[in-house]
């Protein structure tokens, strides 16, 4: 039996509980949160009786194997290092840390510990994406020349997600003082991870960040100063070029990821408009000698989720992806985007 503790009992933690609880041989034995009301509600909802208000107390008194770090972003580093020092495997929500230096510290600590470490880049769960990555990595598309990727949401311009000026789950994401790195740190880390995993590392980037003024200056203690959209031109280490962008004001696009990778022997694309559950296909063309350029849609059976990969890694001792190294690389790109936008120039990564 693999025993887990969940640290942080906000809304995302429900998905962690449900996913891990559905895996045979896994038990959530304790939960921890400084917010007593959140802790009580989460424990009542999921039937977890053992609760802690302090991570120190959890590590000192509870017998378990691994943690799910679902705390706010600014606590990811501290909790992650604390868990590794206590000999616990770590499954961390993204981003791995608030900057690349902190992320590297976590990578080194994980390597020195020999413990299993993973970052929950949710959309790696999409089987269509995994199929696409396998095709690209196999070399079937030849030399990769072009990569274009977007991640668009509409919650600043529609009420599909709710009313962003009335709910704290939206408000903090718009305020740097509340720990937000804007859309770049929220969904940008996802799309950078998705673009680089099949193709390889980005060599240099030119990025422009935008704060939209139409939403107002802020609400109460929340000042709306975090970036709402960004556009980036990129060059990969392998010579490929492309564009990557994200927006929270993309009216009509609920939660839409679109990735297109083009080589000299073919092209491949994935697109899903909800969560990873509808990303079960990819489209591919190898018809380079025809004027029609026929695209074929390929269904991919469900691949293991990050949650399942984490548990399998603990059981086998072999660390699957996406690990802390992937999380650090994504954060390195995010840091470069901030620098590029501020200095209005290309930045080497």
Protein language model features and the residues they cover:
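C-terminal helix-rich "cap/oligomerization" subdomain common to oxidoreductases
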Residues: 1, 6, 26, 66-69, ...
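N-terminal Rossmann-like dinucleotide-binding module
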Residues: 1-46
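Short, Asp-centered acidic motifs that coordinate Mg2+ and/or phosphate
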Residues: 30, 50, 66, 146
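Conserved SAM-binding strand-loop segment of SAM-dependent methyltransferases
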Residues: 48-55
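Beta-strand-loop-alpha-helix segment that lines the small-molecule cofactor/substrate pocket
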Residues: 66, 72-73, 77-124, 139
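Predominantly a Rossmann-like dinucleotide-binding segment in NAD(P)-dependent oxidoreductases
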Residues: 123-223, 344
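Contiguous beta-strand/loop segments that form the cofactor/metal-binding neighborhood of enzyme cores
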Residues: 166, 192-276, 306-316
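Active-site loop of classical SDR/Rossmann-like NAD(P)-dependent oxidoreductases
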Residues: 296-308
């Amino acid at each position: 039996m693999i025993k887990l503790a969940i640290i942080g009992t906000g809304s995302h933690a429900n998905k962690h509980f449900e996913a891990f609880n559905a895996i045979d041989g896994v038990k959530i034995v304790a939960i921890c949160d400084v917010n007593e009301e959140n802790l009580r509600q989460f424990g009542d909802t999921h039937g977890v009786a053992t609760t802690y208000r302090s991570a120190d107390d959890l590590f000192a008194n509870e017998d378990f194997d691994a943690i799910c770090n679902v705390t706010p972003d600014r606590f990811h580093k501290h909790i992650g290092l604390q868990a590794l020092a206590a000999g616990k495997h770590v499954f961390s929500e993204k981003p791995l840390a608030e900057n690349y230096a902190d992320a590297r510290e976590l990578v080194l600590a994980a390597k020195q510990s020999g413990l299993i470490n993973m970052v929950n880049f949710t959309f790696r769960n999409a089987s269509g994406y995994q199929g696409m990555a396998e095709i690209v990595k196999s070399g079937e598309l030849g030399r990769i020349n072009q990569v274009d990727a977007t991640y668009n949401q509409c919650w600043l311009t529609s009420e599909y997600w709710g009313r962003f000026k009335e709910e704290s789950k939206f408000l903090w994401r718009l305020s740097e003082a509340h720990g937000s790195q804007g859309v770049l740190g929220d969904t940008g880390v996802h799309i950078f991870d998705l673009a680089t995993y099949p193709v390889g590392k980005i060599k240099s980037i030119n990025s422009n960040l935008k704060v939209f003024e139409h939403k107002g200056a802020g609400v109460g203690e929340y000042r709306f100063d975090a970036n709402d959209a960004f556009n980036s031109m990129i060059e990969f280490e392998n010579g490929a070029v492309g564009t990557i962008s994200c927006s929270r004001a993309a009216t009509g696009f609920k939660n839409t990821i679109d990735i297109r990778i083009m080589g000299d022997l073919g092209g491949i694309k994935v697109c899903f408009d909800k969560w990873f559950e509808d990303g079960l296909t990819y489209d591919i063309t190898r018809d380079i000698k025809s004027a029609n350029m026929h695209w074929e849609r390929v269904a991919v059976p469900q691949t293991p989720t990050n949650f399942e990969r984490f548990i399998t890694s603990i059981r086998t001792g072999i660390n699957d992806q996406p690990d802390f190294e992937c999380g650090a690389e994504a954060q390195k790109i995010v840091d470069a985007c901030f620098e590029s936008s501020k200095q209005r120039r290309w930045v080497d990564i």
